[in-house]
Amino acid sequence: MTKYIFVTGGVVSSLGKGITAASLGRLLKNRGLNVTIQKFDPYINVDPGTMSPYQHGEVFVTDDGAETDLDLGHYERFIDINLNKYSNVTTGKIYSSVLQKERRGEYLGGTVQVIPHITNEIKERVYRSGRETNADVVITEIGGTVGDIESLPFLEAIRQIKSDIGRDNVMYIHCTLIPYLKAAGEMKTKPTQHSVKELRSLGIQPNIIVVRTEMPVSQDMKDKLALFCDIDTKAVIEARDADTLYAVPLSLQEQNMDQIVCDHLKLDNPAADMTEWTALVEKVRNLSKKTKIALVGKYVELQDAYISVVEALRHAGYSFDTDVEVKWVNAEHVTAENVQELVGDTDGILVPGGFGDRGVEGKIVAIQYARENKVPFLGICLGMQLASIEFARNVLGLEGANSSEINPDTPYAIIDLLPEQKDVEDLGGTLRLGLYPCKLSEETNAYNAYNEPVVYERHRHRYEFNNQFRPDMEKAGFVFSGTSPDGRLVEIIELKDHPWFVAAQFHPELVSRPNRPQPLFHDFVRASITNKESK
């Protein structure tokens, strides 16, 4: 029978529930269990697709085209699985589904209420995640903090699940904070005690408490927490700030967290073999070289907006025993006069995805700098579109060339709406989303990176390269190295007379893994290292 683990949070948000859940998933997978994982977000948006990155951070896209929480990126990178649309559920999705059922008459005229209709819908999403993947274990992270009004239906639903399927099949893990008061020179357990008290008042008794802390947690403190929170002392797990996220699974294993979980759920599996993971962490901790990459973006104040990009750069660096330092460059501040000052000390330039016109001209200046100075360049989504526009303006001489998204009146719409997007009015969930094939041309940097004729990558865009400009740009040295199999859509572009200048319409960062870097990022970092060594 499928087992269910629920991860909740208390005291404050941003405690690392997602990393804890992902780390536990890695440990259980390495015990030979089929693990899937999901995130419940209590906001009323149907998904984060139309939310500002300042509000929510990165939007992570799954193979099947779901726009989801950035925690799913952590889940995929840690557990090395591809998640789906059932892996991220919001209050908006739940209520939308229930209201549609009510309109269809599925409740037979009954009064639709939070209990049982909303809670039943939540439970069905939990069970469905396990069914769709035939999982041995489903890990569900509940977003928000215990005590929030928004989380109550989710907490009630996961309380009911234990009654529905039995205590041996359900486990609750609660993540809290033990603050350190510098003035007093001591740590305080009271916030954790009150958080657990709040959780128990809702009918949920945690089986494990994971305490986030800056300082070591003494045995006396663990005993105190165990007494007041009514759990075993061994089930108080310390989550210290780590030098690398990838060390967290090893820390949890040292404290036997995965064994406690297996004992409670009556899972008789051998201990997790973490030899390869340990070697990865040792490599990360002992990188001997450095390279610096300029990330020119519009959301650089909130680095979570580009978290998968940064992780993909790091993964690529691991392959070359290199620590990739990201230099954050606000695109709004970049001009032709200061671009040398802002990116001249870097070994490579990356322009990530985005929407809207803010910062666009600064990105184009940075792209021109990379092209003219032979600096390795990687463009992603909007970065690919702007690389095309920069070439049209400054090589072909098409003054005013632009994207119709940025300037609907441009005389040269190098980037235009996809034909199937012309009549779309809704913003949410209507982009070209998910996994699509890309056919590569031989003897190109893109083909050399992948070494395969056809690859599959995840997309999130509404605009596309305008094919009427392809002949002129090809004549000028612009290479269309990747297209859709029918040749209609441009997927990858590069430059003929440049050491490494590649840009993709898709989001390669989404499929990178710490032990298996994404090919374009791998070769981009290699080119950046070569550039540094040649200076």
Curated annotation (Swiss-Prot):
Record-linked InterPro entries: Class_I_gatase-like, CTP_synthase, CTP_synthase_N, GATASE, GATase1_CTP_Synthase, P-loop_NTPase
Binding-site residues, ATP: 14-19, 71, 240-242
Biological pathway: Pyrimidine metabolism; CTP biosynthesis via de novo pathway; CTP from UDP: step 2/2
Residues reported to bind CTP: 13, 148-150, 188-193, 224
Region Amidoligase domain: start-end pairs: 1-267
Residues annotated as catalytic: 381, 507, 509
Keyword Ligase tagged: yes
GO annotation, biological process: 'de novo' CTP biosynthetic process; pyrimidine nucleobase biosynthetic process
Positions with a binding annotation for Mg(2+): 71, 141
The protein's Enzyme Commission number: 6.3.4.2
Ligand binding (UTP): 13, 188-193, 224
PROSITE patterns from the UniProt entry: GATASE_TYPE_1 (PS51273)
GO terms, molecular function: ATP binding; CTP synthase activity; glutaminase activity; identical protein binding; metal ion binding
One GO cellular component, as annotated: cytosol
Stretches assigned to the Glutamine amidotransferase type-1 domain: 292-534
Keywords (A to Z) from UniProt: ATP-binding, Glutamine amidotransferase, Ligase, Magnesium, Metal-binding, Nucleotide-binding, Pyrimidine biosynthesis
Annotated catalysed reactions: UTP + L-glutamine + ATP + H2O = CTP + L-glutamate + ADP + phosphate + 2 H(+); L-glutamine + H2O = L-glutamate + NH4(+); UTP + NH4(+) + ATP = CTP + ADP + phosphate + 2 H(+)
Quaternary data: Homotetramer.
Note in the entry: CTPSs have evolved a hybrid strategy for distinguishing between UTP and CTP. The overlapping regions of the product feedback inhibitory and substrate sites recognize a common feature in both compounds, the triphosphate moiety. To differentiate isosteric substrate and product pyrimidine rings, an additional pocket far from the expected kinase/ligase catalytic site, specifically recognizes the cytosine and ribose portions of the product inhibitor.
Role of this protein: Catalyzes the ATP-dependent amination of UTP to CTP with either L-glutamine or ammonia as the source of nitrogen. Regulates intracellular CTP levels through interactions with the four ribonucleotide triphosphates.
NCBIfam families to which the protein is assigned, alphabetical: PRK05380.1 (NF003792), PyrG (TIGR00337)
The name this protein goes by in its record: CTP synthase
